[in-house]
Regions:
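Alpha-helical scaffold segments that form or flank carboxylate-/histidine-based iron centers
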Residues: 18-32, 55-80, 148-150, 155-163
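Catalytic Cys-His active-site segments of thiol-dependent hydrolases/isopeptidases
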Residues: 143-146
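Conserved small/polar residues in nucleotide/adenosyl-binding loops
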Residues: 178-184
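Extracellular structured ligand-interaction cores
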Residues: 128-130, 140, 160
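All-alpha RGS (Regulator of G-protein Signaling) helical domain and cognate RGS-like helical scaffolds
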Residues: 46-51, 64-135
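Aromatic-residue-lined binding/catalytic grooves and analogous aromatic/hydrophobic interfacial grooves
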Residues: 38, 42
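Acidic, low-complexity proline/glycine-rich segments
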Residues: 1-12
Length: 186
């Protein structure tokens, strides 16, 4: 199966008023995500994984002790992560389905507590990675975080919400030059 870079389900500038500028989206989707697709397709050619599903490739190539050296896993997994990411957000505020709200309240005590836990997971991810709301194999909801391109598929979990905490997802919109002091000529 060839990896395909999906079109965004909204205009490239649709998230600007929510903190993700058109420039960030162009870099994130059109450059970073596209690179995962292109690299993944090149690495998959002629391998046993070439005609497998994304999930089969992710599960079959995941090895926690050698993730950093596994180009197929990293590129395919990051492609999967980003395909989920683009679908999980949008420009319009949509109410949470009552079934999900009830499950979150049951699992975390309240929606606000879930939001706190989710934001904390993203903020405390050391280095690059993702934070997730997942449905575990036993049906319970959990907030997790994963390093690099690792995702819930690796652990038999279902991703309900994911947040990319790699620098490329926010660095353009969070750069502040106010702390810089330029040298002056003597």
């Amino acid at each position: 199966m060839s990896l395909v870079l999906s079109e965004l389900p909204y205009a490239i500038d649709a998230l600007a008023e929510h903190g993700m500028s058109k420039e960030t989206m162009e870099y994130h989707h059109d450059i970073h995500h596209k690179a995962y697709v292109d690299n993944g397709n090149n690495l998959l050619k002629g391998t046993e994984w070439e005609n497998k599903s994304l999930e089969d490739i992710i599960v079959g190539t995941y090895n926690a002790s050698s993730v950093a050296q596994n180009g197929i896993f990293n590129n395919v997994s990051q492609h999967w992560n980003h395909e989920q990411f683009w679908q999980m957000m949008g420009p319009s505020k949509v109410g949470m389905p009552s079934e999900l709200e009830n499950a979150i309240t049951e699992s975390f005590g309240s929606v606000d507590k879930f939001k706190e836990d989710f934001c904390n997971a993203g903020a405390t991810q050391f280095g690059s990675g993702w934070c997730w709301l997942v449905k575990d194999k036993d049906g319970s909801l959990k907030v997790t975080k994963t390093e690099n391109g690792v995702n819930p598929v690796c652990f038999g979990q279902t991703a309900l919400l994911g947040c990319d905490v790699w620098e490329h997802s926010y660095y353009i919109d969070s750069v502040s030059y106010t702390h810089l002091t330029l040298p002056t000529k003597a």
